[in-house]
Amino acid sequence: MNETGSIGIIETKYAEFKELILNNGSVLSPVVIAYETYGTLSSSKNNAILICHALSGDAHAAGYHSGSDKKPGWWDDYIGPGKSFDTNQYFIICSNVIGGCKGSSGPLSIHPETSTPYGSRFPFVSIQDMVKAQKLLVESLGIEKLFCVAGGSMGGMQALEWSIAYPNSLSNCIVMASTAEHSAMQIAFNEVGRQAILSDPNWKNGLYDENSPRKGLALARMVGHITYLSDDKMREKFGRNPPRGNILSTDFAVGSYLIYQGESFVDRFDANSYIYVTKALDHYSLGKGKELTAALSNATCRFLVVSYSSDWLYPPAQSREIVKSLEAADKRVFYVELQSGEGHDSFLLKNPKQIEILKGFLENPN
């Protein structure tokens, strides 16, 4: 554990609610939400910021869970004393999405009627449902209006949804490396990942036991991880170099890297959750052009939209489309395209320019 600039040891908390009526009419009961908080809520409760995570993220956005942790939370470079999301000024909340597998209600949760994990019996969850659950959590903390909702990738979709579903519940919205709806290509990559899981002999219609479809999930992660990097970054990192070690498994270093990413992912994620969350991504749509402008028309908050030059999963054009529609709807929006060779994952990585942009947006509300 390296405490330099960190907020230190953090405990994951759990909030339970009686029920949540989902968009499709299903009732999820009870509902558990895993979350973490950083900083102190002001007496007027006007300094709260909600951070929304991406597909494979969780509630652990900053700090450490124990002194033996080797790595801090996934956005520790941006959350903490004096950082972009300054815990000396703001009360930061990050929760695991429902449908996920890091403590919130999802396929791994115990079905109250069977006393066994839901598995594929868990109801379909949408981005809208994820946001509904977050709203329950925020209200339970006594917060009527968030100072900001921020997120990258899938987290950016959640932030967008907050702005239109609860327009009077946030003052600022930060959308990074995201989109208002998936293109056919983006859906295609997710479908390949899902099919890899479904074709695993251990899938068992989503009602698997401890012998889970690890091979299928690893392949899904390998496919997904390709889209998180850029061509330049892969060329720089791997080129056409041979792998180290067993050359029978793969001919190139990039293949060895992807195999490692897949194998390590299955130890921290659930195959059902991967299917549920990617389907939520694919089904989310605010439309295009006039339809998108209309969808954003009731938003009242200020927006910051950030894209990355080398992001080919959610390319800058999709961010510019959001910006164009916000401007057409006469909303206050600031747009930045950061030059980065890191691909889609750029929003997760430490970048002095990004730190400056986020901090400046939050500290200068006018």
From Swiss-Prot:
Cell compartments where the protein resides: Cytoplasm
Listed transmembrane segments: none
One Gene Ontology CC term in the entry: cytoplasm
Swiss-Prot/TrEMBL catalytic activity: L-homoserine + acetyl-CoA = O-acetyl-L-homoserine + CoA
Keyword Acyltransferase: yes
Gene3D superfamilies: 1.10.1740.110, alpha/beta hydrolase
GO terms assigned for molecular function: homoserine O-acetyltransferase activity
Top enzyme category: transferase
Family from the record: Belongs to the AB hydrolase superfamily. MetX family.
Function: Transfers an acetyl group from acetyl-CoA to L-homoserine, forming acetyl-L-homoserine. Utilizes a ping-pong kinetic mechanism in which the acetyl group of acetyl-CoA is initially transferred to the enzyme to form an acetyl-enzyme intermediate before subsequent transfer to homoserine to form the final product, O-acetylhomoserine.
Protein name per the record: Homoserine O-acetyltransferase
Protein's organism: Leptospira interrogans serogroup Icterohaemorrhagiae serovar Lai (strain 56601)
